Amino acid sequence: MQDRIEEVSVRKVVASEFVSLDGVFGSPDQWHFQYVNDEMEETRKEIFATADAMLLGRTTYEEWAGFWPLQGDQGPAGYMNNTAKYVVSKTLAGPLEWNNSTLIDGDVAEAIAKLKQQPGKDISILGSGALVRSLLRDGLLDELRLMVHPIVVGGGKRLFEDGGDQKPLELVDSKTLGTGVLYLTYRPAGG
């Protein structure tokens, strides 16, 4: 009889972001929706289906906690409202009011390591640019998925600001949507 070694799967931390050709990810409500179609909706559903928890930064949490609870529980609102949310902030005070929200105000690396060891699907990050940059810099981001929209916004909040450290990435998947949006999946190089 052969001994079976069960492989323990560790959850990944995966950031999924909308960005313009010039790197803007802020205020997607002003430039993203013209590219939404059934194909993009299917891609969004796939992203949601692979994760059962979210990491959010303070700014994204505050914006979304004032919006999503008022949208009901159908479609994206159901996912946002019912999914476990872990909010990284040194300035927010708990307990957090939005359903299924937990504050991470201590050692972020330790908290994420514990989350990754828990059973479940991946842990997603949507928005939360400062958190994405911090986790990528510190080696805590396992995957970066970018939906690069074929538009030059001309100004706005960039996903990667000037002055950051270089971080080599490896392209592991790419898909071109019918609207010209590129769906690119990267992992830290050598990881």
Model-derived regions, located:
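Short, Lys/Arg-enriched N-terminal segments with co-localized hydrophobic residues
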Residues: 1-9
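Portal/gating segments that form or line small-molecule/metal binding sites
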Residues: 8-140, 150-191
